[in-house]
């Protein structure tokens, strides 16, 4: 579960159109959220508040062997109006989980040709083509907003440990990230890491410097294929693409010890055209250490995800297999939206990346935020989304009584029937046309349109689902450990509790090696 400050940082990235999934360090974020999730230690209480749209504070108190705590502040130059407290926040936004990777279409305002830039300005800002003054004001506002900053600081007690973070947006595709830690127990009483990141739809370039060991690093991530928004406005881009392939590498050199480092990774993310279910596969290789790691993550249904990871070292021939899953529970006794409102909600795209404010439209009080969404979806999906509302229950949401029926394979038959009816209708209407090439192209376009509807509908169902809790389980065959984690909403609190069970090497009996519970409240 994210801390409130981490949640606000993600809101800042979402507000400023910064794509976290395009960062090389997040290439295994999905598998890590399901397999390597942290277990709480002891008792911890976190109380946070956002006094204004620009300023927030957080107080944390924990009891593990001794009582300690921390006090944190966060300030943003841009208003964080898309944030919520623990009472109203979507569980999918507050918890790290499966993420649909879309690095090719989530970023906006990319540095492309002047014709595209002119079209972008005219589509997004020019409501009156004859009002040149408004155009100039909007251009100036966009240029000013592209240089937003975020300041964060935390003080720990008892003791004198401090940590700070500064995010400075240089332009719309480049930012400077500085992290500092001051602790008397560290060498030279602290360390500092500086990141200079250039993030575009096509590639990522990152320069890193750490005062620890005078470490210098370079990271690159390249997305194969042509960007969808290369020659068209982002508002007119297709909502989904079936697959994304990303290849990245990182180079490290410790100047103090003269030690090099090298690793490379590949990520493949796609969606089933028949069910709309997404999956992600990754492969990471470290040739210096001889380590290979591969992961496979698939969202088996709207409320469940399965993940597996296999590690192998070709120097020592050591291997390990890790398995894990997450299972969401649906909220009960909720006031569902009307079918008409739900149909409108399913037609309205909520986000491009799940886990980053993508479920803001699940409650009536989030209506104003949903109205601000600038994403685009074709109005031709209205018939299909109304069919989904009828198919999946009242309000277009999946209720707790439909847990056993929330998988899409049994729901695809109406899609196939509609596809067949559409194909038959098209064939009858075009039977008098002597040009067979036109018929073939039209059938291809029809299939592509229905495939896009399937993937869009599945994502909308995930976004519209109102979850109350999630259970995560992971195990490792080599370590012989089982990790259990429950996260959910209790009244106005977000609660996270879990345990790690391991085999005692002496008695060969299972025992709790770690246990804790966290309470978080924010308003």
From Swiss-Prot:
Comp. bias intervals (Basic and acidic residues): 364-375, 417-426
One Gene Ontology biological process: establishment of mitochondrion localization
Major localisation: mitochondrion
Biased composition (Polar residues): 352-362
Residue span of region Disordered: 352-440
Similarity remark: Belongs to the MDM10 family.
Subunit structure: Component of the ER-mitochondria encounter structure (ERMES) or MDM complex, composed of MMM1, MDM10, MDM12 and MDM34. Associates with the mitochondrial outer membrane sorting assembly machinery SAM(core) complex.
Role, per record: Component of the ERMES/MDM complex, which serves as a molecular tether to connect the endoplasmic reticulum and mitochondria. Components of this complex are involved in the control of mitochondrial shape and protein biogenesis and may function in phospholipid exchange. MDM10 is involved in the late assembly steps of the general translocase of the mitochondrial outer membrane (TOM complex). Functions in the TOM40-specific route of the assembly of outer membrane beta-barrel proteins, including the association of TOM40 with the receptor TOM22 and small TOM proteins.
Record's protein name: Mitochondrial distribution and morphology protein 10
Species whose genome carries this gene: Lodderomyces elongisporus (strain ATCC 11503 / CBS 2605 / JCM 1781 / NBRC 1676 / NRRL YB-4239)
């Amino acid at each position: 579960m994210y801390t409130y400050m981490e949640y606000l940082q993600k809101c800042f990235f979402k507000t400023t159109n910064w794509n976290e999934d395009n960062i090389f360090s997040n290439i295994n974020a999905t598998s890590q959220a399901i397999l390597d999730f942290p277990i709480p230690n002891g008792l911890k209480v976190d109380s946070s508040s956002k006094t204004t749209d620009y300023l927030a504070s957080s107080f944390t108190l924990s009891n593990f062997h001794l009582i300690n705590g921390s006090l944190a502040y966060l300030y943003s130059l841009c208003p964080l109006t898309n944030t919520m407290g623990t009472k109203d926040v979507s569980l999918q936004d507050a918890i790290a989980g499966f993420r649909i990777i879309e690095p090719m279409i989530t970023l906006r305002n990319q540095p492309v040709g002047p014709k595209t830039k002119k079209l972008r300005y005219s589509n997004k800002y020019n409501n009156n083509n004859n009002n040149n003054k408004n155009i100039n004001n909007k251009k100036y506002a966009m240029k000013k907003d592209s240089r937003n900053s975020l300041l964060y600081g935390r003080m720990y007690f008892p003791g004198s440990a401090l940590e700070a973070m500064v995010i400075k947006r240089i332009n719309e595709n480049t930012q400077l990230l500085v992290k500092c830690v001051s602790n008397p127990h560290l060498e030279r009483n602290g360390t500092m890491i500086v990141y200079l990141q250039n993030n575009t739809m096509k590639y990522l370039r990152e320069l890193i410097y750490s005062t620890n060991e005078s470490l210098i690093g370079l990271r690159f991530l390249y997305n194969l294929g042509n960007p969808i928004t290369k020659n068209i406005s982002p508002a007119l881009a297709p909502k989904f693409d079936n697959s994304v392939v990303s290849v990245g590498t990182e180079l490290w050199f410790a100047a103090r010890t003269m030690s090099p480092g090298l690793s490379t990774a590949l990520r493949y993310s796609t969606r089933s055209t028949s069910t709309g279910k997404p999956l992600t596969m990754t492969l990471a290789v470290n040739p210096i250490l001889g380590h290979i790691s591969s992961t496979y993550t698939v969202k088996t249904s709207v409320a469940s995800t399965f993940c597996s990871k296999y590690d192998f070292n070709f120097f020592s021939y050591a291997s390990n297999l890790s398995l894990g899953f997450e299972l969401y529970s649906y909220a009960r006794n909720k006031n569902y939206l009307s079918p008409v409102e739900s149909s409108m909600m399913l037609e309205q795209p909520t986000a491009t990346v799940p886990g980053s404010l993508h479920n803001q439209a699940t409650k009536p009080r989030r209506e104003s935020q949903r109205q601000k969404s600038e994403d685009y979806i074709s109005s031709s999906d209205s018939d299909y989304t109304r069919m989904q509302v009828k198919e999946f229950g009242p309000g277009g949401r999946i209720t707790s009584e439909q847990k056993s029926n929330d998988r899409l394979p049994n729901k695809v038959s109406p899609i196939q029937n509609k596809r067949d009816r559409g194909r038959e209708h098209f064939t009858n209407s075009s039977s008098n046309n002597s040009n067979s090439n036109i018929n073939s192209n039209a059938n291809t376009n029809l299939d592509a349109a229905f495939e896009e509807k399937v993937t869009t509908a599945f994502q909308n169902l995930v976004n519209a689902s109102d979850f109350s809790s999630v259970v995560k389980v992971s195990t490792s065959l080599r370590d012989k450990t089982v990790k259990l984690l429950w996260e959910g909403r209790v009244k106005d609190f977000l609660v996270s509790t879990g345990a790690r069970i391991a085999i005692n090497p002496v008695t060969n009996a299972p025992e709790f090696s770690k246990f804790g519970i966290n309470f978080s409240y924010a308003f």
